[in-house]
Amino acid sequence: MKALIIEDETAAALNLKAILKQAAPDIRVVDTLESVEESIGWLRANPQPDLLFMDIHLADGDSFRIFDAVEIAAPVIFTTAYDQYALEAFKVNSIDYLLKPLNACLLYT
């Protein structure tokens, strides 16, 4: 399974990669992106991954803007420190909403 990580905090992205390697070794992270604009460009230029892990607050805006620019068919797991966006997240392809800091136990459930 191919996954894309959209996360502007380097430490959080590295933590998520480590958790995925431990909890779901069959998931291969194809890229890690840090901004809305970079993500839009990547999604337009590449085949969609099987799964997206997406932070909501990115340096250049909120990641919901990506859905306005690109049709995303893959399921999305939002990873954020803010719980107030849960309803908005489930209006798009969200299958889960994980609050930071992440740990491996969250991915097992």
Please report, for each region that a protein language model flagged, where it lies by residue:
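Non-catalytic signal-transmission and effector/linker regions of two-component phosphorelay proteins
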Residues: 1-2
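Conserved acidic carboxylate
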Residues: 7
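Charged phosphotransfer/docking patches of two-component systems
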Residues: 10-14, 86
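Charged docking surfaces used in two-component/phosphorelay signaling
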Residues: 14-18, 22
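Acidic, metal-coordinating helix/loop segments flanking the phosphotransfer/catalytic sites
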Residues: 17, 32-51
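Alpha-helix termination/capping residues and helix-transition junctions
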Residues: 24, 45-46, 91
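A generic structural motif
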Residues: 24-30
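CheY-like receiver
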Residues: 49-107
